[in-house]
């Protein structure tokens, strides 16, 4: 067409207008910008929406009555259920899960818009008029809502500890396994010993540490003090600062501006 071939307008006009608008001319185009750019944009929105949902789903699981390690802020007078006054439903994160589906729904039609007849038909137009604003607005709203949920999130450390303690120390089985290996037992035998005792705790209850203390093989290779050290949670927190630094990337010190050299 006349636009793509520049039959009526010199390419310099396009370059001038684009520069004034803070844009760059499309390097490979016909009458329209190739829709692979649009597809990449909406695919990115879909990934962001999925990340929002990932966090929302985790909060929903943590708010379950039998877990209750964290939950959405619940205002005074707020209703969780019209029929059951005691309920504190995670309505905000449930809403975020739904919004993520809306945003992801734009990805497939965006991909399908890439293949236009002879590089230009208008089949993409009606599709983009619907999902383009819907996906962008929905994700903007979802991000704002998620920020509010995280900022006001209620966290219950005591419940976290209670949940860890509820399995009688089984969460420390890996540390016991490694300690037995270091004490000279083969990995296969150490695994069998630890698993055998762990399964008994699963079936019969009780404390994992006490079960191991009663195991003669364990007693021959580890003292009670060495065994007790395996049930110390402190080693799991040694590198917590490093983990947080990786996640939040502390701001690097601003570089001092270079001095201009004199003539």
Language model region names:
Residues 1-116:
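Internal glycine-rich alpha/beta core junctions
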Residues 84-263:
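Glycine-rich cofactor/substrate-binding loops
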């Amino acid at each position: 067409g006349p636009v793509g071939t520049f039959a009526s307008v010199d390419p310099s006009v396009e370059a001038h207008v684009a520069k004034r608008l803070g844009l760059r001319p499309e390097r490979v185009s016909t009458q329209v910008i190739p829709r692979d750019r649009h597809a990449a944009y909406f695919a990115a929105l879909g990934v962001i929406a999925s990340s929002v949902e990932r966090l929302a789903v985790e909060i929903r699981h943590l708010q379950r009555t039998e877990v209750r390690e964290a939950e959405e802020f619940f205002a005074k007078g707020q209703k969780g259920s019209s029929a059951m006054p005691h309920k504190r439903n995670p309505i905000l994160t449930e809403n975020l899960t739904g919004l993520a589906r809306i945003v992801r729904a734009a990805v497939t039609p965006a991909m399908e818009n890439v293949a236009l007849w002879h590089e230009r038909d208008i089949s993409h137009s009606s599709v983009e008029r619907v999902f383009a604003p819907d996906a962008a607005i929905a994700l903007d709203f979802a991000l704002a809502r998620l920020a509010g949920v995280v900022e006001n999130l209620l966290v219950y450390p005591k419940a976290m500890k209670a949940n860890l303690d509820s399995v009688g120390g089984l969460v420390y089985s890996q540390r016991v396994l490694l300690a037995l290996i270091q004490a000279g037992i083969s990995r296969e035998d150490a695994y069998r010993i630890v698993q055998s005792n762990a399964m008994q705790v699963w079936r019969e209850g009780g404390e994992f540490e006490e079960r191991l203390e009663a195991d003669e093989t364990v007693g021959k290779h580890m003292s009670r003090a060495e065994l007790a050290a395996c049930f110390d949670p402190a080693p799991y927190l040694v590198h917590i600062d490093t983990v947080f630094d990786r996640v939040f990337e502390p701001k690097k010190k601003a570089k001092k501006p270079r001095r201009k050299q004199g003539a």
